[in-house]
């Protein structure tokens, strides 16, 4: 899944460059000449994690860095000073001040930043990863939102001309993981999620469905069991590690599919 998301990131960056050049080249010759002299400068802003989390932030960082190197494009990353909307917005402000004209936002927590910054910086392209219509509506509407984005025009809350919100079908990766685990001979599976947010839940639901599909195919539905829990955070700690110890120990769990940033460390330590 990380490889697939990395490939998608490369495609999105290429599309951002193409869109930028196309937008600049449709006016007078002088404007086209000026635009040709402007070079793309890419920035990435991390969410609550870091570029060494061996998860979403690190994958995004490495994909941006590799693409920048391959295409001779300057790239920098910014880590907000705290886990807050204000800090993330401040990092975007700093990236723009440093000359970035394509900014990659890593995670659903950037919905408020997309709303606030896309109109403020109309000449900057934003790639918002895992930011869904529901995330935008929840932050844009606030109190009174009925949690059905289909009831609203999401583009009322951000500048659609310079923002691309990219979400993924995590349930497909989850399905393949659950299916493969059962086909490889595991019968007692576990799913450890981070916070119970849509992307994590899609991984989990797919995992359960994949395990169930494999069990039905093998005719062993009464033998396959799945433990399921979300830790409520995107990092491992002693409490979650202890919880995983009970899974591997007294419950007899054989394999754990961990999804949610650094929370995987607790499953790995317990194993």
Task: Give each language-model segment a name.
Residues 1-40:
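Short, low-complexity disordered leader/linker segments with a strong preference
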């Amino acid at each position: 899944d990380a490889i697939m998301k990395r490939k998608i990131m490369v495609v999105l960056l290429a599309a951002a460059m193409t869109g930028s050049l196309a937008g600049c080249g449709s006016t007078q010759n002088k404007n086209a000449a000026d635009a040709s002299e402007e070079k793309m400068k890419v920035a990435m802003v991390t969410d609550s994690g870091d570029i060494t989390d061996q998860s979403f932030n690190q994958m995004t960082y490495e994909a941006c860095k590799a693409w920048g190197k391959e295409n001779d494009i300057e790239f920098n990353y910014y880590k907000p000073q705290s886990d807050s909307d204000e800090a993330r917005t401040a990092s975007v402000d700093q990236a723009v001040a440093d000359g970035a004209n394509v900014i990659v936002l890593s995670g659903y927590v950037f919905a408020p930043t997309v709303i606030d910054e896309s109109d403020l910086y109309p000449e900057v392209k934003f790639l918002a990863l895992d930011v869904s219509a529901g995330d935008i509506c929840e932050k844009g509407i606030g109190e009174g939102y009925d949690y059905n984005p289909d009831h609203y025009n999401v583009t009322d809350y951000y500048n659609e001309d310079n923002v691309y919100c990219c979400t993924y079908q995590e349930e497909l990766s989850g399905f393949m993981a659950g299916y493969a685990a059962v086909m490889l001979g595991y019968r007692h599976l576990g799913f450890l999620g981070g916070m119970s947010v849509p992307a994590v839940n899609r991984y989990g639901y797919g995992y359960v469905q994949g395990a169930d599909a494999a069990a039905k195919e093998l005719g062993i539905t009464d033998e396959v069991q799945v433990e399921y829990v979300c830790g409520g955070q995107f990092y491992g700690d002693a409490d979650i590690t202890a919880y995983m110890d009970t899974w591997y120990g007294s419950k007899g769990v054989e394999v754990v599919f961990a999804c949610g940033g650094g929370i995987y460390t607790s499953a790995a330590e317990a194993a």
